Amino acid sequence: INPKTKIGENVTILNGVLIGQQNRGRKQGCPTIGNKVWIGTNSIVVGAIHIGNNVLIAPGAYINFDVPDNSIVLGNPGTIISKQDATDSYITTYE
């Protein structure tokens, strides 16, 4: 995980995840990750992108683009599926 990455609350990051900096191009920089995000094993999140709130990134996904709130992202290249309860049963919040 690049130390310049901004990570929100209730974020789960599993084994083998790379959250990195892109050193050139339009997306030069590090990711910003919202609240209530679940990032699956061996996923890659790279560049000055924004991952919204309530997002599930499936294992092995490659993300180098902005992801809106309430989404599931899977595959390489990543494909976005809109889902209101994306992280339900993956992230427990205590209120």
Residue ranges and their predicted role:
Residues I1-I81:
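Structural signal for interior beta-strand "rungs" in well-ordered beta-sheet cores
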Residues T79, A86-E95:
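Terminal amphipathic alpha-helical/low-complexity segments used for targeting or macromolecular assembly
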